[in-house]
């Protein structure tokens, strides 16, 4: 395969590529630190809201597009199956609205893509449930419509966003905005880390994840890894 002209480094220019690794990883780390220092109280409040919904029999719905759809599925799975193998707890009811290709394509074809998540919230959401929207721009219309519907029908709303927060910032009861206006990847890296921290906090708030709890639940569980 012919290498494209205009590449700044050849295949053997190891030092240039190592700089890319350092620049990318260090920028991502600095961005996460900025988000953590500016939003720790909000993240705790998000986790407390999710834990409260679970404890009262409600469920968490999650939606997003593209990489954010993958993050929605990732986080929903860790709520329902488990987050860390050292913490033993019941399944927690989280549903990613991004997994049913038949529902998504039917909604896009029959109602328009902007309505796909709203329709699924209408189907699965109930007053007292919680909707988490993920959007690196803050302006994904399908997510905007879903949060708007949820707010009007007795659900609480959360959002993990990027840029300046966009339209979704005003629709979420609680939101964290990653202050990055470039490519979506840096924002998504923060979002998945935030999601992991939130799951950890929810488990702690619900009484799971403590040393005492782990000792009581050790028998009968195999330690598995991905």
Swiss-Prot record:
One of its GO terms (molecular function) is zinc ion binding. PANTHER family: SEDOHEPTULOSE 7-PHOSPHATE ISOMERASE / DNAA INITIATOR-ASSOCIATING FACTOR FOR REPLICATION INITIATION (PTHR30390). The lineage of its organism: Bacteria, Pseudomonadati, Chlorobiota, Chlorobiia, Chlorobiales. Belongs to the SIS family. GmhA subfamily. It is an enzyme of class 5 (isomerase). Substrate binds at residues 65-67, 78, 109-110, 135-137, 140, 188. The reaction produces a racemic mixture of D-glycero-alpha-D-manno-heptose 7-phosphate and D-glycero-beta-D-manno-heptose 7-phosphate. Residues 50-212 form the SIS domain. HAMAP family: GmhA. GO terms for biological process: carbohydrate metabolic process; D-glycero-D-manno-heptose 7-phosphate biosynthetic process. Its main location: cytoplasm. InterPro entries: GmhA/DiaA, Phosphoheptose_Isoase, SIS_dom, SIS_dom_sf, SIS_GmhA/DiaA_subfam. This is Phosphoheptose isomerase. Catalyzes the isomerization of sedoheptulose 7-phosphate in D-glycero-D-manno-heptose 7-phosphate. Zn(2+) binds at residues 74, 78, 188, 196. Keywords: Carbohydrate metabolism, Cytoplasm, Isomerase, Metal-binding, Zinc. Binds 1 zinc ion per subunit. Its cofactor is Zn(2+). Pfam families: SIS_2.
């Amino acid at each position: 395969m012919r290498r494209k002209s205009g590449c700044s480094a050849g295949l053997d220019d190891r030092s240039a590529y190592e700089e890319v690794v350092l620049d990318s990883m260090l920028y991502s780390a600095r961005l996460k630190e900025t988000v953590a220092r500016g939003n720790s109280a909000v993240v705790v409040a998000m986790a407390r809201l999710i834990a409260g919904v679970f404890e009262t029999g409600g469920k968490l719905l999650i939606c997003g597009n593209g990489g954010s759809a993958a993050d929605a599925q990732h986080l929903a799975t860790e709520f329902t199956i488990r987050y860390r193998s050292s913490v033993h707890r019941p399944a927690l009811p989280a549903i990613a609205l991004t997994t049913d290709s038949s529902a998504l394509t039917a909604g896009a074809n029959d109602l328009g893509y902007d309505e796909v998540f709203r329709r699924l919230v209408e189907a699965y959401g109930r007053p007292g449930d919680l909707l988490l929207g993920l959007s690196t721009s803050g302006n994904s219309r399908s997510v905007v419509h879903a949060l708007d519907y949820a707010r009007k029908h007795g659900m609480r709303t959360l959002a993990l966003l990027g840029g300046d927060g966009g339209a979704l910032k005003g629709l979420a009861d609680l939101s964290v905005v990653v202050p990055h206006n470039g490519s979506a990847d840096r924002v998504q890296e923060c979002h998945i880390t935030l999601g992991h921290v939130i799951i950890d906090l929810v488990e702690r708030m619900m009484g799971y994840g403590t040393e005492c709890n782990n000792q009581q639940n050790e028998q009968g569980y195999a330690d598995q890894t991905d």
